[in-house]
Amino acid sequence: MSAVPFTRVLLISGFLAHLLLSTFVTLTVCKEVTEESDDLSKRNVLQRQLWAVGSLMGKKSLENTNRRSDEDMEISALFRGSPLKVKRSD
């Protein structure tokens, strides 16, 4: 029966100790992160802005729009050089 050198036993046991320690550290960090995200999700549900819900979205911006008259559109077409037909009274 051959004997295993003592340095090799220390090397293997040291590797296993580091592996166990790193596993423990990562598990505790992951658990803390998930606990914080659970608390944040509970808080965000209560801070919901009600003006941006469903059928109310965009209503504020549609009430105050100004419609341009036909005369204004003809004048702007002249300045832009648009190919729109413009009635001229001579």
Swiss-Prot record:
Expression across tissues is: Expressed by the skin glands.
The residues forming the signal peptide are: 1-30
From the Swiss-Prot or TrEMBL record, state where the protein is found.
Answer: Secreted
Highest rank taxon of the organism: Eukaryota
- Give the UniProt keywords, A-Z: Amidation, Amphibian defense peptide, Cleavage on pair of basic residues, Pyrrolidone carboxylic acid, Secreted, Signal
Q: Which GO terms describe its biological process?
A: defense response; neuropeptide signaling pathway
User: For this UniProt entry, what is the primary localization, expressed as one broad class?
Assistant: secreted
Q: Name one GO cellular component term.
A: extracellular region
The family database entries (PROSITE patterns) matched by this protein are listed as: BOMBESIN
State if Disulfide bond is listed as a keyword.
no
Propeptide residue interval(s)? 31-48, 61-90
- Pfam name, any one: Bombesin
User: Which residues are recorded as modified (Pyrrolidone carboxylic acid)?
Assistant: 49
- Any idea which residues bear Methionine amide here? 57
Similarity annotation: Belongs to the bombesin/neuromedin-B/ranatensin family.
**UniProt name for this protein:** [Leu8]-phyllolitorin
Q: Which organism does this record belong to?
A: Phyllomedusa sauvagei (Sauvage's leaf frog)
